[in-house]
């Protein structure tokens, strides 16, 4: 019986008990009764998002937030403010972009085209995943879609090469495909699902984050971390098996079908989205306007049909993110933001005076915290975003610095349960999946790569005035 008790069960019970104690005892002098009730509701929502008791979904946690907000009679404009965030209307089209890549076969075509130019060496094959990940990240921020496209191809490669299951070579190929689906797109706002999410959270806190802001703070460290991870993976997980030249030739002999009209149309639209987002300073259109226009084009040109509307978007995740966007206004309306700021801001004082100490201490804490917050790091970002202006006011640390730390730490994957896309990748790979030992080593390489990337990034951020 005791063996069947999981960490998730213990965590769920503890968080539920904390919420009950807060509602009954009202222990915080700086919070009134409504704030205590709302805080309890937030803790229950976080419990659902992190531990998923009774297999409850992300959307259910969002509905718990709405319920508690209505119970204490907050205005609907506060409770449901997340649904009016432009970032949400960037995210919804993003799901359609990913669905289009899968439906038309464009994503697989791009990936296979890159694999076919490889030489029969591990170095060539491993580095091939970088342009595949970058290309797919330009076309869609949906990491789930990129994983769904790239992992089956990686598995096919391992089978064609007849690599031993659980071997270093097998794990290296699968892990690299997963990592390149996850990490490179973090360098720009529309390359990862966190982009629209963080943009919305920051907007709720009165901070505007543009496409250019995101690239300025994250492109360099992400590029460095990506490159170092691939190189480190080759060194630490150096395969014992040789690759068969005949296997590469077998892949090259797979002749793809002629590119369809839908694929061509999709490619034009998706590239146009990226270019338009990159040149926003010239034409003045917001990312939300660009993405919604592109989504409409898919339907107008017949790439998507009405029946695709329900299939394309993950409405469970959309409701969750919309309600998470509402956390900032909920915090402000109930006074929780001020209360949290009174705890967090003084706690940062010992490290805030030195940019190097601040960045590395905060990054180390967030990497450790990622072992607890396994809900894509979204709950942590939701809690921190409303108090970042207070941190900036106290210590002149620009919120953009926090965004970089959130993203780098949020991608961590030391342990099997820690990263939802790692879990998804292992599921897709089946008996071809990497071993826990190989994942641990690869995750440690990523952590070290991020620290080295920050060594380069911190001087850039200092020169950019992000530390006052």
What are the roles of these predicted feature ranges?
Residues 1-4, 156-239, 422-468:
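Membrane-core helix-loop-helix motifs of multi-pass transport proteins
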